[in-house]
Amino acid sequence: MKRKITAFAAVLMLMQAGLCGCGTNEAQVETAAPAQAVQEKQAEQAEPVETVAEDGTKLSSDSSDFVLLSEAVPDAILEIRYYSTYNFVGDRIDGYEEPVAILTKEAASALKEVSDDLNQKGYRLKIYDAYRPQKAVTNFMNWALDTEDVRMKEYFYPELEKDVLFPQGYIAEHSGHSRGSTLDLTLFDMKTEKEVDMGGTFDYFGELSHPDYKEITDEQYENRMILREAMTSHGFKPLEEEWWHFTLENEPYPDTFFTFPVSENAVSKG
């Protein structure tokens, strides 16, 4: 077991070096996935398992405190981008077995209050992503190592070179989404039956995605603030780089990253 953990630590060092412009090669891309899988596989057994990675990260496969958003917030619209191929990678992301959204019970309860308030104003919530398994984050890391794969650059990061995505924080080894109380969403206008114009698209890497970006219309800015105010009024905190991203301030698992897949069955087993 010690050999596997040591290999995992070594691979992370290689990944970090490559992403900082110190040299990337195909061998790094190919070895990163199996090494990371050692840690993730331990936390994906039939019975809930908790493990600690070499970097100190607590991993867990226990889904017992999670719920499906389709049940907790039934009027929410789901467009799970990482289940589709329309995302910055261009492929379905590892760990997304079904187009469902999952959150901790606490986050889902708070989101239901947000939804109820916005319904009175003529809006529904549209969810792009919620709980994200650690396996998916590893998928992002491996994709970032392959600097030749720029299929989706014109749609999601036209202003940036791919090799800066990790140093600038767009891609990271761990994501708050994996703790289960973070989600990405927008507003859906029930009158027009269209998404509200936010002056930018989900997962666009650049300043355009900052909530307070100045070069959008007054209406687009106001729409961003409607979403932001509704979320913060019910205990969610925003991210200053992404208008769509919110985390429950009192999240129940601030130090645990979960590994179970995104699927109905994963939650029903919890």
Language model features with spans:
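Extracytoplasmic cell-surface/polysaccharide-interacting catalytic and binding patches
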Residues: 22-130, 135-241, 250-270
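Conserved metal-phosphate-binding beta-hairpin within the catalytic cores
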Residues: 246
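Sec-dependent N-terminal signal peptides of Gram-positive bacterial secreted proteins and lipoproteins
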Residues: 3-25
